[in-house]
């Protein structure tokens, strides 16, 4: 009922970027499109991850504030790399694996990318609504080209390793699968930490670094999507690609 009392223009501005990216990724799934109900559930899991991350981030900030002085380099590193990035990417990954690892629909390597992006954009969608309602339309425009596609990029990096982990698991290579699953959490968490850390530094130089970081991250993510979509194959095949 709460949505009836919200500005529909702000709500649209908050959700359209995420929906646009979801449609693009869905269409990139070349071999076999995923069940719509599964994808919808992943978006909902992403929304759940938002709430869980809010709790752990609040608790983490309380602990950090009792140990470190705020707005120092060390404080920001601990906050954005450990508290924020580990919380958000950790819950995304845990819910992603819980919902999809044993799903019969998870039969292609690119599926890992699709699933991870849907969870990430579910997270971004709900987070974006909160920011836009609090700060207005200008925030929606900025986040439409930064935070929302940023979460999608984190999902690409998570999903690329996650899909590879599933293939190794199917091949019986459990050690390789575990390493890939660990990377599916660690790499997006590191990229997320870099994103937040650079974005919060109050310096013109860091502003340009942030723009460059986003540009490089977007380009790499798009290349990964294009390559994995083009060369996608069923998990049952023994060969790998990345």
Predicted regions, residues:
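Hydrophobic alpha-helical segments at protein termini of multi-pass membrane proteins
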Residues: 1-242
């Amino acid at each position: 009922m709460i949505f009836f009392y919200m500005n529909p223009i702000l709500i649209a501005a908050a959700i359209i970027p995420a929906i646009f990216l979801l449609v693009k990724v869905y269409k990139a799934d070349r071999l076999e499109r995923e069940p719509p109900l599964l994808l919808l559930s992943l978006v909902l899991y992403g929304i759940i991850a938002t709430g869980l991350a809010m709790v752990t981030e609040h608790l983490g900030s309380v602990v950090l504030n009792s140990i470190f002085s705020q707005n120092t380099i060390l404080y920001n590193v601990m906050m954005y790399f450990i508290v924020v990035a580990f919380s958000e990417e950790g819950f995304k990954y845990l819910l992603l694996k819980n919902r999809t690892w044993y799903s019969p629909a998870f039969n292609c390597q690119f599926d890992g990318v699709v699933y991870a992006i849907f969870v990430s954009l579910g997270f971004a969608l709900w987070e974006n609504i909160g920011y836009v309602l609090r700060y207005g339309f200008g925030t929606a425009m900025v986040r439409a080209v930064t935070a929302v596609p940023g979460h999608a990029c984190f999902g690409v990096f998570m999903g690329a390793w996650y899909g590879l982990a599933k293939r190794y698991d199917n091949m019986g290579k459990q050690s390789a699968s575990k390493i890939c699953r660990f990377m599916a959490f660690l790499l997006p968490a590191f990229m997320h930490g870099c994103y937040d850390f650079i974005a919060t530094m109050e310096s013109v130089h860091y502003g340009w670094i942030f723009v460059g970081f986003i540009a490089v991250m977007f380009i790499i993510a798009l290349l990964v999507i294009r390559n994995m979509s083009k060369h996608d194959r069923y998990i049952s095949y023994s060969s790998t690609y990345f």
